[in-house]
């Protein structure tokens, strides 16, 4: 049974807000942490992932583009600490391809960011940060982020979401 520990909806987020949420999250991520990013094409999933990875690039004074793994499925970054793996399952067509990727090994050795996690089917991890991007181009291009902690026990992650909620509520 999957336990939803905590959740919150951040409404009307622009790209600067999304980047700030990603930057704050980057400060607490450790090997074994998994982020599942859901949402339609163009909602900001890749942008969010790049913002997180870029924060670590800055720490290590790495100045290079962060490509989307849309065609390669996986992009790893083992030149930073913690090591990152960015997975984009959009183009994956068969569940048998998941076995070839070796996600269990990736989960144990990297901070893992997965776009289009719906394609994981029954292979979803037991614990993860679920971030759903809700994008409405018909209403002033509004973007909402729904963040849920699924099976998470990390006090740092709970504190991150609690602090984020508090700061957000003070702004509205």
Identify the residue ranges that each predicted region occupies.
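Hydrophobic anchor at the beta1->P-loop junction of P-loop NTPases
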Residues: 35-37
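Short phosphate-coordinating micro-motif centered on Lys-Gly-acidic
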Residues: 6, 104-172
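Conserved lysine of the Walker
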Residues: 45
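P-loop (Walker A) phosphate-binding loop of NTP-binding proteins
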Residues: 40
């Amino acid at each position: 049974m999957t336990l939803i520990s905590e959740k919150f909806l951040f409404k009307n987020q622009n790209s600067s807000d999304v980047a700030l949420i990603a930057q704050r999250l980057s400060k607490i991520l450790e090997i074994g942490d998994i982020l599942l990013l859901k949402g339609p094409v163009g909602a900001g999933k890749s942008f969010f992932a790049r913002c997180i990875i870029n924060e670590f690039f800055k720490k290590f004074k790495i100045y290079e583009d962060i490509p989307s793994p849309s065609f390669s499925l996986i992009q790893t970054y083992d030149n930073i600490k913690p090591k990152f793996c960015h997975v984009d399952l959009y183009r994956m067509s068969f569940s048998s391809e998941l076995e070839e990727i070796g996600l269990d090994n990736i989960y144990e050795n990297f901070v893992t960011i997965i776009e289009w996690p719906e394609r994981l089917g029954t292979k979803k991890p037991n614990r993860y940060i679920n971030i759903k991007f809700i994008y409405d181009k018909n209403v002033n291009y509004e973007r909402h982020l729904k963040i849920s902690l699924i099976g998470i026990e990390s006090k740092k992650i709970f504190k991150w979401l609690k602090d984020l909620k508090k700061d957000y509520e003070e702004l509205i």
